[in-house]
Amino acid sequence: MPANSALRRITKKALYSLLGDSSYKYFQAASKAMDIRNGSWSEPELELIPFAIRPGETALDLGANFGLYSYHISRALGAAGRVYAFEPVPFTFETLQLVAKILRFKNVTRFEKGCGEKAGKISFEVPVQASGAFAAGQAYIGGRRDDREGKETQVRWASTREVVCEVIRLDDFLPEINELSLIKCDIEGAELFAFRGARKLIGKHLPTVICEINPWFLEGFGVRLEELTAFFFDQDYRLYHYRSQDGESALVPVETRDVVEDNYVFIHPQRLSRFASILVGGA
């Protein structure tokens, strides 16, 4: 059954109504683990992982959700490598733990925490689907202004549930990690806050950063797109968009003005050689 088929959505709604939160997570974990393993849940940028990292290095998965990126990064890093995965929402984290058990994550350290500019307890809003189940991948830090122009296309839920989660600063929480080569970040508009809290780590290691960028969500936090890209441009990073179609793959340079809602890749010149075979314009 495809990962987002109509039949599957109907099945999930029925099961959630029958099982409720506490038991539904077992079904959710089993189905997500199957999707991850067989590739029916995927993103094009997963193809960049073998370019970005080497066995034995370290990676961060911010907004780990149910472990899609953690799984693929873990396999590429090998037994000597390490993934640190952060997922603050309790239901999602519990499901991630089950997925990790099913898929036998060996080198993924998981934390029930979010990442931000300041440490503390923070309210998150978790969208609720028509079935009553959480839309876990769309949870966001409270305070984002969604009741504004553009809501019709960006807000795909009728209600949210508030949960209080712990947020840490990565510079304080993981000051001694070695060989940080990749950060994946997808936290629904709060990406710049996480990066500011990891300023020292990023400046020291200059990791490749795979980041979802949604300008509308950024604006909801009072952040301009230019502020996000400038954080990296000020450290000499370059911005790319990954295109993969009909067997052809390419990393294409992008200007800030051309950014729309999608995944993007920030790469420092020191790491460009790793991507030389797919870089448009060369390293």
Predicted features along the sequence, with ranges:
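Phosphate/nucleotide-binding beta-alpha loop and adjacent structural elements of enzyme active sites
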Residues: M1-A283
